[in-house]
Amino acid sequence: MQRSLPTSSSRPRTPDFSASPRDLGAIPFNRPFATGREIEYMRQALAGLHIAGDGAFTRRCQEHLESLLGAPRVLLTTSCTDALEMAALLLRIRPGDEVIVPAFSFVSTANAFVLHGARPVFADIRSDTLNLDEDRVENLIGPRTKAIVVVHYAGIGCEMGRIGEIAAHHGLAVIEDNAHGLLGRWNGRPLGSFGRLATLSFHETKNFSCGEGGALVVNDGNLVERAEILREKGTDRAGFFRGEVDRYTWKDVGSSYLPSDLLAAFLLAQFEAADTIQHERRRVWNRYFEGLRQWSQYHGARLPAIPDQSDQPYHMFYLLLPSAEGQQGLIDHSGVSTSLR
């Protein structure tokens, strides 16, 4: 190896290849960021005696996201996985339906629909961005196809113009699994604002975190009322608290998808520090990119590809290695912690 991987110090460190990763003090796979106001806001939630779901901090987070994405409704959920499961319920996915999903993604992208009996139809990905290959989607559409699920991998936008055209032509819903892409844009438009529905993740590995959490972005106003009902155990409880009904009752299927307001309090502090968080992530991402440029050429590895239409949120930095053989040894010797084993 000609060059060591960058570290958080100002001067790159040359690793001792005779040492173990533990001796090297491996660069961690993820280091959650704290702004300093998370505990303060959680104390405020406790003092307000409302720590269940849909409290003041939940509403503030949702309003922030609605403004950011231009969505008629955003609902915080207990995870991005739960938000995807809500999307399947909202689209009334049933056994025998088919849903097109990228062949490269986290399991939740497909699992949320398989849970309701759907058959996942896997579309190959592009070799440059690792996103769903828009040129392969149309040939996968059949009489049972109900939706196309896109994943903006590493926060790099899919080709939403072409995918939207295909979906509209065939009368299909588009769902954006935007777990990686909050604050990302495609042709100047926010990721998460293209599909009828989109999902977000606030897991500890994401740019903005509350440990475990997510959100459902409802871009189709016709789905808002039912989304609220599904999220509240199938009841019209949300309407009751707005004074729209004199009592709340069981209206539909549903589950309990509300996160505690304590988690929303933590998350709001993260949103308020967005500029600081993004500045640091951009700095680190660019340092990796520049520091690994020569190294990648020497080892035949590929760095992330960012299309001109894409404004990325600096969520993830990845390497495409030429072969699986020896890759873990190479990574271990570099003193970098990964999720590969």
Where are these regions (language model features)?
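Short beta-strand-to-turn element immediately C-terminal to the catalytic PLP-Schiff-base lysine
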Residues: 200-201, 214-220, 268
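Conserved SAM-binding loop
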Residues: 76, 101, 122, 216, ...
